[in-house]
Amino acid sequence: MKVLDEIVANRKKMVEIEKRKDIIKNLRSFIDELDIDVEKKRKLRLSKAIKKAKEIKNPIITEIKPSSPSKGSIREINLEDVKNIANEMVEGGATALSILTEPKYFNGSYKNLIVAREFDIPILMKDFIVDFYQIDVASEIGANAVLLIVSSLKEDIGEFLDYAKENDLECLVETHSEDEIDIALDAGAKIIGINNRDLKTLKIDLSTTEKLAPLIPKNKIKVGESGIYTKEQLNYVLKFTDAALIGSSIMESENIREKVREFVIK
């Protein structure tokens, strides 16, 4: 079984468990405990933040990613660590935060996103979305955008885009091939991610961005994803995109604030 297929199959099972447990109710209680004004934070927009950031700095979506299938454990963190890391990322100049909420393969959690929601910055809920229920959760916990992966949702992606819009959420629609870009565009995607990592093999090729970006109309927002470890690599990706999503290299850094700042400065 390919890595993506395995993750998606597991996520479908987990979502059914989440539904039965009515986790939204528990998450609401957690939000109340932290006294976070989720309603106020819902007004933040990823697309607007990227456009504004481009005028003065490199627009970087920094990712809180504890582990991954390709690297294993990246950084062991608790909720207090998440808050501190998010703060360092914001102080470093991040345009938005991406929070992993997939629990088994990335060691993420919805509570990580809620803790990071304290900050006035757009938040992308990064997960393998396979069910509308996950979009309900994203809306409840204060996410501003969700990740939709074309290779897992395929032609159904239009329905998920529509449902997210109904819940006042933007979508980062992830692609890795010409066919997937066609599907994303046909579905009406406005923010399109180009993943330099092949989710079937986990191999990275930064030239994927260069090959695919010209296929995306200029009125769309393009985001380069995966494989960015140096400023040189970032500059290469940003030649073809409007923003970049960076996770592992920041999470591995001993000084997250300075690492983000290094990427952000033009």
UniProtKB/Swiss-Prot annotation:
Pathway: Amino-acid biosynthesis; L-tryptophan biosynthesis; L-tryptophan from chorismate: step 4/5. Keywords: Amino-acid biosynthesis, Aromatic amino acid biosynthesis, Decarboxylase, Lyase, Tryptophan biosynthesis. The gene is trpC. InterPro entries: Aldolase_TIM, Indole-3-glycerol_P_synth, Indole-3-glycerol_P_synth_dom, Indole-3-GlycerolPSynthase_CS, RibuloseP-bd_barrel. Its EC number is 4.1.1.48. It comes from Methanocaldococcus jannaschii (strain ATCC 43067 / DSM 2661 / JAL-1 / JCM 10045 / NBRC 100440). GO terms for molecular function: indole-3-glycerol-phosphate synthase activity; phosphoribosylanthranilate isomerase activity. This is Indole-3-glycerol phosphate synthase. It is an enzyme of class 4 (lyase). The keyword Cytoplasm does not apply. It catalyses: 1-(2-carboxyphenylamino)-1-deoxy-D-ribulose 5-phosphate + H(+) = (1S,2R)-1-C-(indol-3-yl)glycerol 3-phosphate + CO2 + H2O. Belongs to the TrpC family. Gene3D superfamilies: Aldolase class I (3.20.20.70). The keyword Amino-acid biosynthesis applies. It comes from the Archaea. GO terms for biological process: L-tryptophan biosynthetic process.
